[in-house]
Amino acid sequence: MTYQAASGGGARHMREVLGQFRDLGNEVSAELNDPAAAILEIDRKVLAKQRSGELDTAQFGVPLSGSLIPWIDSDLGNGQSREEWKSDAETNKILGLEGDDRVIMDGLCVRIAAMRSHSQALTMKLTEDLPVAEIERIIAEDNQWAQVVPNTKDATMEGLTPVAASGSLNIPVGRIRKLAMGPQYISAFTVGDQLLWGAAEPVRRMLKIAVGKL
């Protein structure tokens, strides 16, 4: 399950969601400044504004602020979105895997109102029963960017959010634990700034390679 930031759509999408937040805030500004205002009345007014058709939704099609959109990209006609298809196709292409060697990946892709840094919740079935500490060690030692976050509330709240990951090449990986489905089933949650990894960083690396060959 991916939780993808507004910036995945582009600059205009980021502006749109910020504008929606602004308009929703303006709708209940008086109530927010009144400690005696009932929260249910504030919620009613926000929901009415979201449903009014007055918010700018030219980019996303529906309000994203204070909500989410459980569909990204085009409809492939088989119940799957193109973004969900890409997760399997691109992963195996990057790994160079074909046929029976392919890693089977599937899930839902959801747009959320974070500004940048995509997140994903993973359910993995391993081929053998490994201790959690060993899994954490493998992840931590694989590359310089993966940063294991201890599976505690405080560490998760501090280091495993889009706010914590944005602007950095580090990829926090946390919530690693055994699942009740069986000892080979492992959960994990990751966050990464796709504006760096998906755009700026590949270009920077290509330029370094090109400059090195001049």
Task: Please provide the spans of the model-predicted regions.
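Active-site-lining helix/loop region of Rossmann-like oxidoreductase modules
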Residues: M1-I138
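C-terminal active-site/capping subdomain that shapes the small-molecule cofactor and substrate pocket
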Residues: G99-L214
